[in-house]
Amino acid sequence: MTSKKFSDKKNNYDAILVGAGIMSGTLALLLTEILPELKILIIEKLKIPGSESSGAFNNAGTGHAANCELNYTPLDDYGHLKIEKALSINRSFEKSMSLWASLYSSQKIDIKKFLKFIPHISFVTGSENVSFLKKRFKKMTEYKEFEDMEFSSSFNQISSWAPLITKSRNPLDEVAATRVKRGTDINFEVLTREYLKYISKNKNVEISYETELNDLKKTSNKEWELNISMEGRKVNLKTSYVFLGAGGKTINYLQKSNIPEAKVYGGFPVSGKWLICEENSLTEKHNAKVYGRADIGSPPMSVPHLDTRWIEGKKFLLYGPFAGFTTKFLKQGSYLDLFNSLKKNNLLSMLDVGIKNNDLINYLFSQSIKSHKSRVENLRNMMPSADPSNWYLENAGQRVQIIKKTKKGGSLKFGTEIVNAADGSLSALLGASPGASTAVSIMIEVLKKSCLFTLDKSILEQKISHLLYESELKNQNENDFLENLKKRNNSILGFHP
């Protein structure tokens, strides 16, 4: 993809977005729809957009709606199911669906290029896990968001849903599964490019590839000055607002900003690998995303899943992820990334997390040294008939988990977190899952806290509501609103229950 040249001799912008992945793409899309007069620049170190964390093989492509991800509904100390996170994620994902429906109906993006509907299944074995899944099903179906969820402990029924997970399995095994037909597989790489292709038609939007951020600092007149490298030269740019959405590298850029809010953060890099199958006789038999339950005490990234994926018009099966450790913060990053992030204000927190999470470090090490045979043995827990010759190993993307300094020392946080400068002039996105699936909700919050929208916030709410078609459904109670929102999204996006 080509870059637009800088058109303003003074190199002044209303907003500069660092990184051309799904997060920056979503924010840029919202900005151009809500505030089309803004002069926006997106800079990307690589030659093409969406090729790091958003890359098709660098993530699972799951439209995270908490349909099947059991780690989103943990048990509390009293054995009660905690559902708040699942509800929040589901509602956030519906906002993403609403935006896509809005853009597709106005012919601004083509959803057929990046979105496929596919059932989301939770599958467990053993009495304890079956009991948990029953409890989860009963609790979740009390809510409108999950009323269409199905439960079965019938071996034959589960076989009809996902035959590969029961083939060669003992039919006397205690098993259970839930299914939500309205699941999705999403190619976030293609979605990112759809966004950028559309917004690049706006004369106020510029996108520059092979462009790297070297430094950024606040000037005396409260603007940001960014020093970048492009086309073999260094250029200084000025802007009122900066968004740092560069995946794992964001932590390094955030530290360069020297905002007080950045001083409590560090990053813990986690790599990943997939087992991939292209064998047609297998890919045609599996049409679902099947998530299992992680072992007690295991980190969230250890949740195993067997996914149907469509990438560049071809169907694949992916199993994993198998975690690992590297000092890189990006797949195409530097082995110095972790060391460059160590500062005097986060070093003790980083060391504290290392001491407290010795089990995690051991887990990552054990995952890193697994043989192909051992990885296939893991796969057989989900797919007993797996043949090693049908599967090959491929690197997934890098994730940098958040380390945050607290009164009790360093804390390792899984998930996504927004860091905002007090004056709203800079925002940074840290962390990982559910990330891309909830990008619309996350970027709406970024927009609300930014300095870009100086009018009454209620006007911003109205603009967002209009963009997401939610204004058409106002004055309805919560359940009716959600039901009609889903019906409208289903109709436009092509899901037929």
Swiss-Prot record:
Substrates-to-products reaction catalysed: (S)-malate + a quinone = a quinol + oxaloacetate
Gene Ontology biological process terms in this record: tricarboxylic acid cycle
InterPro entries tied to this protein: FAD/NAD-bd_sf, MQO
Molecular functions (GO terms): 2-hydroxyglutarate dehydrogenase activity; L-malate dehydrogenase (quinone) activity
Pathway: Carbohydrate metabolism; tricarboxylic acid cycle; oxaloacetate from (S)-malate (quinone route): step 1/1
Top-level taxon in the UniProt lineage: Bacteria
Transmembrane intervals: none
Record key words, sorted: FAD, Flavoprotein, Oxidoreductase, Tricarboxylic acid cycle
EC number: 1.1.5.4
One Pfam family cited in the UniProt record for this chain: Mqo
Cofactor(s) annotated in UniProt: FAD
Similarity annotation: Belongs to the MQO family.
HAMAP family, per the entry: MQO
Designated name of the protein: Probable malate:quinone oxidoreductase
Originating organism: Prochlorococcus marinus (strain MIT 9515)
Name of encoding gene: mqo
